[in-house]
From Swiss-Prot:
This is Large ribosomal subunit protein bL34. It comes from Rhizobium etli (strain ATCC 51251 / DSM 11541 / JCM 21823 / NBRC 15573 / CFN 42). GO terms for molecular function: structural constituent of ribosome. Residues 10-19, 26-44 have a biased composition (Basic residues). The keyword Kinase does not apply. Keywords: Ribonucleoprotein, Ribosomal protein. Disulfide bonds: none annotated. GO terms for biological process: translation. One of its GO terms (cellular component) is ribosome.
């Protein structure tokens, strides 16, 4: 059986990166929430 997590830096950046987050309204809310929490890393 193939495992579900097949790491790829490119896919990770494209799906969960900062620019991907900023490109949607919901993503901007995610970044804002993580800023409010004081997260060291905002996105992948």
């Amino acid at each position: 059986m193939k495992r579900t997590y097949q790491p790829s830096k490119l896919v990770r950046k494209r799906r969960h990166g900062f620019r991907a987050r900023m490109s949607t309204k919901g993503g901007r809310k995610v970044i804002a929430a993580r800023r409010a929490q004081g997260r060291k890393r905002l996105s992948a």
